[in-house]
Amino acid sequence: MFFTCGPNEAMVVSGFCRSPPVMVAGGRVFVLPCIQQIQRISLNTLTLNVKSEKVYTRHGVPISVTGIAQVKIQGQNKEMLAAACQMFLGKTEAEIAHIALETLEGHQRAIMAHMTVEEIYKDRQKFSEQVFKVASSDLVNMGISVVSYTLKDIHDDQDYLHSLGKARTAQVQKDARIGEAEAKRDAGIREAKAKQEKVSAQYLSEIEMAKAQRDYELKKAAYDIEVNTRRAQADLAYQLQVAKTKQQIEEQRVQVQVVERAQQVAVQEQEIARREKELEARVRKPAEAERYKLERLAEAEKSQLIMQAEAEAESVRMRGEAEAFAIGARARAEAEQMAKKAEAFQLYQEAAQLDMLLEKLPQVAEEISGPLTSANKITLVSSGSGTMGAAKVTGEVLDILTRLPESVERLTGVSISQVNHKPLRTA
């Protein structure tokens, strides 16, 4: 007869022809009824609540510990299964669990006696590993393997753990206050450093902005200089172009006038020819002399008109070129003239003063004699002595002009006669 079992139990067949007994974990086996016997053993995992009440630790402090262990009979290992069958075959799971629990509780008490409360409380992992190691080596001889062991609870009736927690709490609170103070200190340092870096960055930014503004002003000034130069060149070119355009317009106008006058001359010639024919028809011989005269007059007038038109055209052209050239050269000429005058005045001090005075004397004389040129009539009254008539007027004018150097000396403090007779002195 065949018997089967699940993976959570094992079968042991003994009797006729079964020496040693046959152990089958999770499978089937053939059994001869009446002459062979079959027994079953559970391979289920057993959960054990391992309690150790008031166990004295290494320093003599009694504490209670509760651990949770998972154990089972190992069915895959034949030797362990054989050992388990020898010890637990025919026993229930509760009986097997009680035996394993007593063994674990004894090892747990032994480990507690070799450790302090602080070690058990603070390093539960170490305690669990030691219990697991010691209990496993003992239970394996029974065919039981410890799947896991975990420390569940630690307590005492003397408030030792509570006092230990208070001390630890006080230490933690102290460390927390110290940490908070250090954190505030570090935060203040970091904040001050951040403010310093912010101010430094702000100053650096302002410096960069100032540099950028300076570069902008320099570039703008250079650009303005270039723009003004180009604008001045453009204005000068525009003025030159305007002058050339005016010149061209004037030349065209003169050409038109020349053409018109040529047409007028042609009309006059036609009129002369008509009159000649008319005179010839009336009185040819008596009018030949007059005709000859008219022809000569007409030719003279024609030549005069042509020459006048050409002269006007040339004058307009030259005037336009002179204006165009003057626009471009006036500034340079004035600047060179002023520079040369300044150099001359620096080089020839008194001679330069004399040159200036002599240059202005004709203008002064012109202004003095100006009223005489505008007079329509001069009436002379004399007592009979001295010169009379135009000679008298001339003498008066010459007398005024001879006193002119004295007037200049009184006004400017410079004597023309002294400067003229001195040798030239240079600076």
From Swiss-Prot:
Domain of life: Eukaryota
Subcellular location: Cell membrane; Endosome; Membrane, Caveola; Melanosome
Function: May act as a scaffolding protein within caveolar membranes, functionally participating in formation of caveolae or caveolae-like vesicles.
Gene3D superfamilies noted in UniProt: Band 7 domain
Disulfide bridge map: none
Membrane topology: Peripheral membrane protein
Coiled-coil stretches: none
PANTHER family: FLOTILLIN-1-RELATED (PTHR13806:SF46), FLOTILLIN-RELATED (PTHR13806)
GO BP terms in the entry: axonogenesis; cellular response to exogenous dsRNA; dsRNA transport; extracellular matrix disassembly; intracellular signal transduction; plasma membrane raft assembly; positive regulation of canonical NF-kappaB signal transduction; positive regulation of cell junction assembly
Keyword Phosphoprotein appears in the UniProt entry: yes
GO cellular component, one term: uropod
Oligomer status and interactors: Heterooligomeric complex of flotillin-1 and flotillin-2 and caveolin-1 and caveolin-2. Interacts with ECPAS.
Organism: Pan troglodytes (Chimpanzee)
Keywords recorded for this protein, A-Z: Cell membrane, Endosome, Membrane, Phosphoprotein
Post-translational modification Phosphoserine, affected residues: S19, S163, S385
Alphabetized GO MF terms: protease binding
Pfam families given in the database record: Band_7, Flot
Phosphothreonine modifications at: T387
Family under the similarity heading: Belongs to the band 7/mec-2 family. Flotillin subfamily.
Main location: membrane
Name the record gives this protein: Flotillin-1
